């Protein structure tokens, strides 16, 4: 791991639990909160991918709102503008996974540069990490907005190279999303897949370099590699 100089983290689902919006969904739709959250996230991802394919970019906030409105129509729920705003704002106050803040500090203390590389807008990324009190742990908060295309497009991953000023082989990419880890691997990043659910990886011609249960294991990865530099 001595060749790794920086780490780029995905935000949604990797550092932060996207389903921490369930509480707000449950308040609005009693007994159906988890169902709403699950379909909402599914459509949010689909809309970012489809818009990239169609070259019809909108901000992540807009894609999130569109996905919520679809979800409510699909499930037959009324959703006025005020309720839509409350629910979408919950995406700005996601809960970090418990191990994330202390492990980020440990990684920084090792001299590694850290960044978020997210499909979120600059505003949404800043709000999420700021509300969680971990903004200062990152050297860069990288949004795909400048290239107007979402991960897993190559141009999105290239933003991390530009921000760090490093070759992609020196940047470890970390994501809990199999499609994201696949895209990063095709781009040429050494890649950790955070596999909290014990799932099988996607069948798209790539495998992650490391299949880990959580962010804690990244620290242990560097611990075990001290004094050696295993190839990726």
UniProtKB/Swiss-Prot annotation:
Temperature dependence: Optimum temperature is 65 degrees Celsius.
Site (Important for catalytic activity): 14, 151, 157
Gene3D superfamilies membership: HAD superfamily/HAD-like (3.40.50.1000), Putative phosphatase, domain 2 (1.10.150.240)
InterPro entries: 2-HAD, HAD-like_sf, HAD-SF_hydro_IA, HAD_sf, PGP-like_dom2, S-2-haloacid_dehalogenase
Residue segments, region Important for catalytic activity: 175-180
UniProt keyword annotations, A-Z: Hydrolase
Gene Ontology molecular function: (S)-2-haloacid dehalogenase activity
Catalytic activity: an (S)-2-haloacid + H2O = a (2R)-2-hydroxycarboxylate + a halide anion + H(+); (S)-2-chloropropanoate + H2O = (R)-lactate + chloride + H(+)
Role noted for this protein: Catalyzes the hydrolytic dehalogenation of small (S)-2-haloalkanoic acids to yield the corresponding (R)-2-hydroxyalkanoic acids. Active with 2-halogenated carboxylic acids and converts only the S-isomer (or L-isomer) of 2-chloropropionic acid with inversion of configuration to produce R-lactate (or D-isomer).
Protein name: (S)-2-haloacid dehalogenase
Species annotation: Agrobacterium tumefaciens (strain RS5)
